[in-house]
Amino acid sequence: MAQLSLQHIQKIYDNQVHVVKDFNLEIVDKEFIVFVGPSGCGKSTTLRMIAGLEEISGGDLLIDGKRMNDVPAKARNIAMVFQNYALYPHMTVYDNMAFGLKMQKIAREVIDERVNWAAQILGLREYLKRKPGALSGGQRQRVALGRAIVREAGVFLMDEPLSNLDAKLRVQMRAEISKLHQKLNTTMIYVTHDQTEAMTMATRIVIMKDGIVQQVGAPKTVYNQPANMFVAGFIGSPAMNFIRGTIDGDKFVTETLKLTIPEEKLAVLKTQESLHKPIVMGIRPEDIHPDAQEENNISAKISVAELTGAEFMLYTTVGGHELVVRAGALNDYHAGENITIHFDMTKCHFFDAETEIAIC
């Protein structure tokens, strides 16, 4: 079990490329933290600095109150799982899982106990005598997890461990890793570019862009209360719809749209002196409904109708704006069809058009 403190962490390479900028985070014992962001945002570099595989250029890394900046990787009581399984093809599953313990000269009976315990948790008991070549991708990834588990480390680090798996296996392994966290009851830090993995697995999500932390929070918090337009657009699939306009009286207006703003949101906008200034309204696809209400109804034309099974994703044109609408599958929708859509303005978000920071 472990608590981590990352204080003003920096990573600057010799060519002066600033990869991680003033990273601050307190991780409590038994949390499942997910670093998420686009490629090149610094998430894997941060993970590698925690592991001791990258030198920290500035700031302090503390594990259980002890400064770890200069402590070798092998002495940090950390286990790591990589995107590449890195299994020894000539060894059995048992020997792959036991290899690190053998190198530490741990007693054979202890090794046997740990390997069998991990194999039981991961459903690998019947595969212990097989070699990696005889296993599926999901089974090989479980072996890699098992190799980390047997170390009984205080912190588990995972760097995009599911990215080599197909879509069905990724869903299955997401659930297995979440169950594993519950069984081990330990601190886990997980890196991914997939916001669905972040939303479904994390206790808290750390969203990064260009080496800078954009927001830290529980999945529901970052989804419902994004700190800025980047977070709002990155978290959620399909992404949040954005419309640029201004506030005129109690209306959000563009050249072709006029939508009534709820009183509580309007009060915040007035407090922030956002009236008559360029502003961005954001609204998620599920908060635009393909049915008419008393107000905030707009005519839309469907350009693409995607049936995913339980629902439709409707790609529409609304007054010159391209908007995605999430609709139930009870009705049929077709490209070229004109529909009336309703904006649930109680669910909309407003952002400063210049800074892109959330207003309300």
Swiss-Prot record:
GO terms for molecular function: ABC-type transporter activity; ATP binding; ATP hydrolysis activity. PROSITE patterns: ABC_TRANSPORTER_1, ABC_TRANSPORTER_2. Keywords: ATP-binding, Nucleotide-binding, Transport. Pfam families: ABC_tran (PF00005), OB_MalK (PF17912), TOBE (PF03459). One of its GO terms (biological process) is carbohydrate transport. One of its GO terms (cellular component) is ATP-binding cassette (ABC) transporter complex, substrate-binding subunit-containing. SMART domains: AAA. PANTHER family: MALTODEXTRIN IMPORT ATP-BINDING PROTEIN MSMX, OSMOPROTECTIVE COMPOUNDS UPTAKE ATP-BINDING PROTEIN GGTA. NCBIfam families: PRK11650.1. This is Uncharacterized ABC transporter ATP-binding protein YcjV. It comes from Escherichia coli (strain UTI89 / UPEC).
